[in-house]
Every structure is written in structure tokens, then in C-alpha cells.
């Protein structure tokens, strides 16, 4: 690429779902703005946006128990409703893009897949029933079903029931209108749209450094890994959507807003089967209940995944530890991220999360046979010869300073933006990709406060519930969801 004397309007660092989503929003709002995308690998969507690296796809808080904790005997559904509202905004934007012809063939990235929760034992069944009662009362979840009848659960997901002891107490909820999303395919479609409309994509280009110019723009130093040459680009606005690579780049930027933040990398593993006979008997995303004291990322689930038109089943995740911040990162990533301003929060997190450390150690030393036993608890007929292990992506949990504890480990995502709005980045993980649209709307609101009022009308045209809740009028909620389901070719 040639260096330009004129600064580009937008530089997107990282070719994943976040950069692709933000770029598409900006291109829809400001078609004449210049956009350049820099991806360090030879393809886009090869890290956390890749479907085989992504822990939860179609995240809508329909089946994940960690979003509905029980406190003082009451099930709290606030997190679940917030995440589901966010997912509805993502669906609305995708539906707009399909209608506009910007993203063709929705079945190539989103497919109807029921979401289920499955538990064993009387106490867990009673909890699931209370959760069901609390959620079904909300307009977003009124279509949820519950059963303790093995015959009914068998009709929903046969593999959960086959060869299970007849006297075992089991229970399940099902939300038939769930989805499976291939964020790798969606990312590629969005990047294709951007490049077809003037954006420049630079693969094998790694941003190595950046500094702010006197006029407020940013100067980026970029290495072309193919020719080992260095290029330099100036940009009016920079978004760092580089997954685990976002923290080091935000640290290099020197913005004060990144002080006190650290990252805790966690790797993952799956069991996967592509056997058509097994796959045909399970069409659902089924989440279980994490063991007492285990962290949220340990929730076991048996997932239908549709990638490239082919259906597979994944079970896991099994956590592990690697100091890399990216699957194809450096073993020095964690240690290189330590700064005087974040070492106290990091030490505080280590002190207060011994159960997480214990869990990771137990996962690291667990044999393949012991890990497979966890699958058999879900699927009694599971046979090791039908399944193989695959390595998932890296997720970097946010560690941040806290006035009371010194530092806390945050399960979720966090936008870090400079006060002047010239640069922003995204830290963290779950729910991540499924809520990419509302997260990137937050970036627009924080980084372009002088423009957001003028953008409100086109944003509302693209995302009808921008600024409002889908469930604000319970009578209209089903119709709103049905409209996106029809455009995205989802059975509902």
C-alpha cells in the first residue's frame, strides 16, 4: 500500500466482527468517509470471530444460567433481558443489511436453532422451574417451554435422554426461536461489503505502534509481514477491535483511560463430532449448570454449529491457560502487558479468584477420559471414537482497578475510549459477538457525540429499536421479533 499525506477518516485495527460491524455502520452513515482495515493474519475472522474459536454463538441469554442468578430466593433476570435486548438490535441491523442487499443469503450466517437449558437432580430442577417462571413473565421470553418429562425432553433433544437411568430427575427449558450464528461468515460478508464500497483491506499488516499527532489525529506504524516493510498512516479516528490484541495497542497509545486495566487470558478446548447420524439427532444449543465455585466460562454446553453449510456438534468448553492474548499470539503477551498502573489490580484479582485458578489447574491436569465423562453426563450414548478434540480461541477477561478491592475480574466486554473520542478499543469477551451492534453503537455515541444527533434518523431506519426497548410495548414485542425472523429466513 502507498502512504497518504492526507489522514484517512477511519482506521479499523483487526479484521473481526467488531471492526466489520463498526465499519459497516459508519459506511451506512457516512458513505464518503475513507476507511482502512489492517489485519495481522492472512484472512479476516481467524481469531475470536472464527466459529470454531467462539465459545457461544447466537448468545441471547435464553439458556445461559449465569445471566439469571438467584439471590435471597429470587431469580434475577435483569442481565438476561439486557443481553436479549442487545441481541435484538443486532438482528435488526442484520435484517436491514439483508433487505438492502448489502448482506445476501442470510442462511449462510444465521440459522434457526432452539436454545435449551438442561439440568439433573431434584434441586437443580426446582431452580430451573423458578427460573422458567420468572423469565416466562417477560415479553422477550414468553415463548419459553419447560418440562421434567423425559419423553418431552427426548422430543426436543434425543441425545440428552437416550440410555439415561429412568429414575434420574431431569428438567429442561426450550426456546424454539433461538439461532446459531456463524460470525466468521458474517464478518466476511461485512468486509466484502466494505471493500466493494471503497474501504481498503490490508491483510498480513500488523499495527506495531501508534501515537497522537498535535492536531488530534493518530499516526500508526504498521509492518507488512509479507515483505517485512513498514508503512505509516495517519487517521482521524482509530478503532482497535483486535480481540486479545486490543489491550497492548491501547497501552501503546498512551491514553489515560487504559490505566488500571489488565488482561487474564484463558484458552479453551472442545470435543467435536461431524458424524451425520449423531448430528441429525441433536438440533439445539443445550447449556447445563456449572459446578459450584466454577467460573461462568465453565458452563458446559452441547452445541449445534452450522459452518459453511455443514453441521457439527461441539461440547465443552474445557478451559486451559496460555499467556497468549491471541490464538496466534506470543507467549510473552501477558507479561508484556504488565504496567506499574495495573500490577496492583492484577495481584488483587489473583488473590480474590483462587477458585478460578484452582479450576484452571484442574482442567489442565484432567485426562481426556475425565473430560469425556463430562460429555457423557449430557449425552449418555457418547462414544470416544466418534469425537475428536479441537483447540478453541483465546479469550482475555478484563481485569480493572476497583476502589474497594484494588482490582476485579470482569466477565463481559468494556469499551475504552479516549476523552476526545479519537480512539477506542474493545476489551473482554462474552457475550461479545452477538451484541456487536449495540457495542459499536456505544462506540459511535462516545466517540462522535457531535454527530450522533444527526445520525439518529438513519440509525432508527436501520435499527428500529435504536434508543428504545423491544419489550417496552409487550403487545408489539412478538411482531418486532417476527419481522426480523422473516427477513433473516428463521423459523419462529
UniProtKB/Swiss-Prot annotation:
- The yes or no answer to whether the keyword S-adenosyl-L-methionine is present is no
Q: In which pathway does it act?
A: Carbohydrate metabolism; tricarboxylic acid cycle; oxaloacetate from (S)-malate (quinone route): step 1/1
Q: Which residues cross the membrane?
A: none
| Names of the cofactor(s) | FAD
Enzyme Commission number(s) from the entry = 1.1.5.4
Q: Which UniProt keywords apply?
A: FAD, Flavoprotein, Oxidoreductase, Tricarboxylic acid cycle
Q: Which GO terms describe its biological process?
A: tricarboxylic acid cycle
Domain of life, per UniProt, equals Bacteria
Instruction: Note the InterPro entries from the entry.
Output: FAD/NAD-bd_sf (IPR036188), MQO (IPR006231)
Recall the GO molecular function terms of this protein's record: 2-hydroxyglutarate dehydrogenase activity; L-malate dehydrogenase (quinone) activity
| Catalytic reactions on record | (S)-malate + a quinone = a quinol + oxaloacetate
- What SUPFAM superfamilies does this protein map onto? FAD/NAD(P)-binding domain (SSF51905)
Q: Which family does it belong to?
A: Belongs to the MQO family.
Q: What is this protein called?
A: Probable malate:quinone oxidoreductase
**Which gene holds the coding sequence for this protein?**
mqo
Amino acid at each position: 500500500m502507498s502512504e497518504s499525506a492526507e489522514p484517512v477518516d477511519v482506521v479499523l485495527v483487526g479484521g473481526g466482527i467488531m471492526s466489520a460491524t463498526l465499519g459497516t455502520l459508519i459506511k451506512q452513515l457516512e458513505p464518503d468517509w475513507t476507511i482502512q482495515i489492517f489485519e495481522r493474519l492472512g484472512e479476516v475472522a481467524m481469531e475470536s470471530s472464527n466459529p470454531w474459536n467462539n465459545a457461544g454463538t447466537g448468545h441471547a441469554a435464553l439458556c445461559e444460567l449465569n445471566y439469571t442468578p438467584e439471590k435471597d430466593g429470587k431469580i434475577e433476570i435483569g442481565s438476561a433481558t439486557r443481553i436479549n435486548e442487545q441481541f435484538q438490535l443486532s438482528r435488526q441491523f442484520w435484517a436491514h443489511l439483508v433487505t438492502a442487499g448489502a448482506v445476501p443469503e442470510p442462511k449462510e450466517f444465521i440459522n434457526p436453532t432452539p436454545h435449551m437449558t438442561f439440568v439433573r437432580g431434584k434441586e437443580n430442577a426446582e431452580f430451573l422451574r423458578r427460573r422458567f417462571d420468572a423469565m416466562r413473565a417477560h415479553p422477550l421470553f414468553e415463548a419459553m417451554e419447560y418440562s421434567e418429562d423425559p419423553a418431552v425432553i427426548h422430543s426436543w433433544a434425543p441425545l440428552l435422554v437416550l440410555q439415561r437411568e429412568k429414575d434420574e430427575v431431569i428438567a429442561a427449558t426450550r426456546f424454539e426461536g433461538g439461532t446459531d450464528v456463524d460470525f466468521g461468515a458474517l464478518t466476511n460478508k461485512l468486509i466484502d461489503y466494505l471493500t466493494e464500497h471503497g474501504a481498503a483491506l490490508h491483510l498480513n499488516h500488523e499495527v506495531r505502534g501508534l501515537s497522537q499527532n498535535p492536531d488530534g489525529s493518530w499516526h500508526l506504524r504498521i509492518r507488512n509481514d509479507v515483505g517485512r516493510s513498514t508503512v505509516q498512516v495517519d487517521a482521524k479516528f482509530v478503532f482497535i477491535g483486535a480481540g486479545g490484541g486490543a489491550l497492548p495497542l491501547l497501552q501503546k497509545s498512551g491514553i489515560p483511560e487504559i490505566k488500571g486495566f489488565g488482561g487474564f487470558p484463558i484458552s479453551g478446548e472442545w470435543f467435536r463430532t461431524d458424524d451425520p447420524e449423531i448430528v441429525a439427532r441433536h438440533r439445539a444449543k443445550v447449556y447445563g449448570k456449572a459446578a459450584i465455585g466454577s467460573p461462568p466460562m465453565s458452563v458446559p454446553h452441547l452445541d449445534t454449529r452450522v459452518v459453511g453449510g455443514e453441521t457439527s456438534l461441539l461440547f465443552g468448553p474445557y478451559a486451559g491457560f496460555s499467556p497468549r492474548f491471541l490464538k496466534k499470539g506470543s507467549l510473552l503477551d501477558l507479561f508484556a502487558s504488565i504496567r506499574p498502573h495495573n500490577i496492583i489490580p492484577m495481584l488483587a484479582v489473583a488473590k480474590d479468584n483462587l477458585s478460578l485458578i484452582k479450576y484452571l489447574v484442574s482442567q489442565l491436569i484432567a485426562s481426556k477420559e475425565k473430560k469425556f465423562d463430562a460429555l457423557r453426563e449430557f449425552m449418555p450414548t457418547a462414544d470416544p471414537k466418534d469425537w475428536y478434540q479441537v483447540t478453541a480461541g483465546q479469550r482475555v477477561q478484563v481485569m480493572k482497578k476497583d476502589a474497594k478491592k484494588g482490582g476485579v475480574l470482569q466477565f463481559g466486554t468494556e469499551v475504552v475510549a479516549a476523552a476526545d473520542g479519537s480512539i477506542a478499543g474493545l476489551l473482554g469477551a462474552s457475550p461479545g459477538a452477538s451484541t456487536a451492534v449495540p457495542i459499536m453503537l456505544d462506540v459511535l455515541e462516545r466517540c462522535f457525540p457531535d454527530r450522533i444527533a444527526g445520525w439518529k434518523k438513519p440509525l432508527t431506519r436501520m435499527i428500529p429499536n435504536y434508543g428504545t426497548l423491544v419489550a417496552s410495548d409487550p403487545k408489539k414485542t412478538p411482531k418486532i421479533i417476527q419481522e426480523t425472523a422473516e427477513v433473516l429466513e428463521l423459523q419462529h
